[in-house]
């Protein structure tokens, strides 16, 4: 018993030493792989624990003959076997994966029967460095590119986005001089994975992907252009929104004609887009109508909006078709109200408020449009703001706490608070206006929206002369170094 106890302690110390070496290896320290193999580690473990192959086979739930062949080098270790051996040695999952890559793939043979399962297992354990190392080695032989890409697709569909992105990046890097659909799909996936709350980064991500859209399958191009247009819309890049929307509408009309004309009907095996084809035509008009609103061309905006209010021409059928047809009709009603409000037609305000009451999920956008119209046309909308005071406070508190979904949602909410600040400052309700404006600056800093940070600064400077010294000090703190968590908490109550 005493000998077994001492041996056990020695093995624990040895395992800790191995882990220490492995950690330092990742940091640029000692190289475990240069002096060790999985088999040598296993043999040393058996020696120090005084276990026979039969005893360890029972502990690891492996057949003793199989284990003997592995130790004697007569057969390579399969992934499942390696995991069992690792557990039986009391080591953490995936401990030997880097050695496995060296021993059996880089120094052995690149057998996809080992590579594929190893990539998936590394993804399960979030071993991204191992994935990159393995993928780079595999891509030395371009014949593996389709298999590697398919693995990335499997991970993407399973929600393992970081692991998928690591593989997409390597496939794209290796095939960067190829004019292939696979390269374009890699960039498409990287685009969707990389979108975040950082607006500057989103612009870079969109610009990197856009040149690859035309290399995608014609059907994939529709969804890609839709997502690009939505990204540019969140970035207030209206020229790019219009460009992407126009391309999407043109391509969708071509595909729609191919589908509905019997003499040119697509085959049943043709790839289908994520939505019915008419959706992309109508959504193109919706986006272009929004662009016209932003540019102040309200007559043309109404033309686009009336065009998707009547979709009687649609010949596609099914529940999904009816779902989107009804939604576009509802959206057209609201968007026509918005255009008329922006043009100064206050008579539709009551009708638009009634629409918002029936569609509470549109509240943020609804209030944003009402405030933009009020600020542009110097309208008094106090009654409407009083009606939604509780909801506005909730939106404000969520922004201060950072409780939001994606960049587009936070962008809209931050814009709403900016318009509120503008509204109250113009009305000379300075305490409320400055409080909201400071919150606005914080949130535009969070999403790195330089355009609206500049607009917020411009608005503050316009009213600086009526700001208290305390407010000016808080303002300078935000601009010079950003607010600390404690300082941000000072701006938590609406109208304080």
Q: Which residue ranges define each predicted feature?
A:
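C-terminal non-catalytic interaction modules
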Residues: 25-51, 387-394, 417-496
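"A position-specific structural signal for the A-helix of alpha-solenoid helical repeats
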Residues: 117, 146, 150-154, 182-189, ...
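Alpha-helical scaffold segments of alpha-solenoid architecture
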Residues: 281-407, 411-417
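DNA major-groove recognition helix of helix-turn-helix/homeodomain DNA-binding modules
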Residues: 80-95
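Short alpha-helical DNA-recognition segment
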Residues: 50-69
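Helix-turn-helix repeat elements of alpha-solenoid scaffolds
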Residues: 120-131, 156-168, 194-208, 238-266, ...
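Solenoid-like repeat scaffolds
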Residues: 62, 102-105, 123, 135-142, ...
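Residue at a conserved register position within TPR or TPR-like alpha-solenoid repeats
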Residues: 122, 155, 194, 228, ...
